[in-house]
Every structure is written in structure tokens, then in C-alpha cells.
């Protein structure tokens, strides 16, 4: 699922390690070093924030949200789920699973599977079936009317299409004329 949103109050503790997002975070350099920093096995996009948040939580450090904290980030076109980072998401999902014994980025992986980009492999990982094409990019691209791209909206649309497809396959066959 998507990350939890900010708290109702100005400051709130988040008990879910997935709240960590390196787009905007603060801690002392000493604490960062004591925690071990970011795991260098994560290459490219995907999973590195979740891993760092999990590491912080595993060491007993609390995560806090600060509502209204300002972060300036250079605009760039992006996609959610990030189909344009398919290869690194797949590789990093495996790094996370090997390290923590459980998967991460399941919502993205589910969407990639529904798009026909990947399938599960017998070892519990994922096999890439194809690179994303323009229709995948169009589906996941941030739209002008949206403040951000949303994996949840894309996944809802894909799940709905899958349900309609499965419902159609279960419909009784028409009798021959």
C-alpha cells in the first residue's frame, strides 16, 4: 500500500517503518553513521528508503512526521508505479527480501504483474517478461490535474480491469446457433 499520510497534529510519531522517505528527513550525522547509513546494495530506484526506515526501526529509533515541513524538490516527470525503473525495482525487491526475509514494494510488483511486465518465479522472486511500452508509461504518468502520480489509482484501475476480464472468462458460453 501507499505510505501513511501525515498526522492530524503538527507532529506525530509513525509506528510504521515505511513512513521513512528520504525525499525529506533529518537526523544527526552521528545517528546516521551509527545506524549504518543507506545500504549500498540498493542500486537505482526502489526499496532503499524502506530498507533504511526498517533499519532505523529495528534499532529502536522512532520515526516522526512533521506536518507542513517544507521540502523543495526539482520537478521531474515521474510514474507511479515506477515502470520506468522496472529493472532496479525488481533487483532491489530481491535485496530487501534477502535481507529481511519478506518482500517490499508489493503494490508496485502487483501492478507490474497486472500489466504483464513480470511474473513470479519458482524461487519466490520475479521474472521480467518485457520492458514497459508507451501504454504502460501513459497509464502510470503523473497527469496534469493530479498533484502527484498515484500507485493506488493505477492499481485500482488494473484490478478493476482484471476483475472484468476474469468475470468475462467465467461467463457461460453462448449456445451455438
Predicted regions located by residue number:
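Active-site-adjacent helix/loop segment of glycosyltransferases
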Residues: 58, 62-131
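Residue-level signal for well-ordered alpha-helical scaffold segments within enzymatic catalytic domains
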Residues: 30, 34, 55, 95-99, ...
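Charged, low-complexity, helix/coiled-coil-prone segments
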Residues: 1-4, 25-42, 108, 124-136
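Short, charge-rich amphipathic segments
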Residues: 15-31, 121-124, 144-147, 153-163
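Membrane-interface aromatic/basic loop that binds lipid-linked glycans or pyrophosphate carriers
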Residues: 135-177
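Short, flexible, basic/aromatic active-site loop/helix in glycosyltransferases
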Residues: 1-18
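A short, conserved alpha-helix in the catalytic core of glycosyltransferases
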Residues: 19-27, 31-36, 41-69
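A short, structure-level motif marking secondary-structure boundaries and short turns
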Residues: 13-15, 36-39, 78
Amino acid at each position: 500500500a501507499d505510505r501513511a499520510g501525515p498526522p492530524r497534529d503538527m507532529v506525530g510519531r509513525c509506528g510504521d517503518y515505511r513512513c521513512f522517505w528520504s525525499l525529506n528527513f533529518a537526523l544527526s550525522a552521528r545517528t546516521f553513521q551509527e545506524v549504518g547509513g543507506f545500504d549500498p546494495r540498493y542500486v537505482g530506484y526502489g526499496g532503499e528508503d524502506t530498507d533504511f526506515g526498517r533499519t532505523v526501526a529495528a534499532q529502536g529509533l522512532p520515526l516522526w512526521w512533521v506536518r507542513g515541513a517544507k521540502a523543495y524538490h526539482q520537478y521531474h516527470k515521474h510514474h507511479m508505479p515506477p515502470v520506468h525503473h522496472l529493472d532496479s525495482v525488481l533487483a532491489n525487491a530481491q535485496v530487501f527480501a534477502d535481507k529481511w526475509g519478506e518482500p517490499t514494494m508489493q503494490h508496485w510488483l502487483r501492478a507490474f504483474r497486472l500489466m504483464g511486465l513480470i511474473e513470479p518465479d519458482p524461487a519466490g522472486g520475479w521474472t521480467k517478461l518485457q520492458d514497459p511500452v508507451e501504454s504502460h508509461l501513459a497509464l502510470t504518468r503523473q497527469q496534469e490535474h493530479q498533484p502527484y502520480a498515484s500507485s493506488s489509482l493505477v492499481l485500482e484501475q488494473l484490478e478493476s480491469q482484471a476483475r472484468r476480464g476474469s468475470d468475462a472468462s467465467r461467463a457461460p458460453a453462448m449456445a451455438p446457433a
